[in-house]
Amino acid sequence: MAYRIAFASSDGKVINQHFGRTQKFLIVEIDEEVAKYIETRENKPSCEEFQHTEDAMTRSISLISDCKAVFAAKIGRGAIAKLDEAGIKSYETPNFIEDIIDKLLTTKKTLF
């Protein structure tokens, strides 16, 4: 069964963005033994000047609502709670996107 994952990344290679400050999410679909790039979604960051608004947070989560998980370099506690409420697993790991995808494909694990 295929599922989508969002990665908070400035360059499409490394998970290097804070969830609340990322300007884009790279969307990848995982299906059995294949990972497929879907698109890059532009995001208006929900954190500005060390705080966030509920509307902006809701907008960011809505942008990735078709994803089962999001990977970011950092994710605040409030965002983790809101993502969980939306049914989106959150993972805080500054890593290479390709390494995460390879691990998912080789272990044949789902995140859910």
Language-model features, listed with the residues they occupy:
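Mid-chain, well-packed structural core segment of small domains
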Residues: 53, 59-89
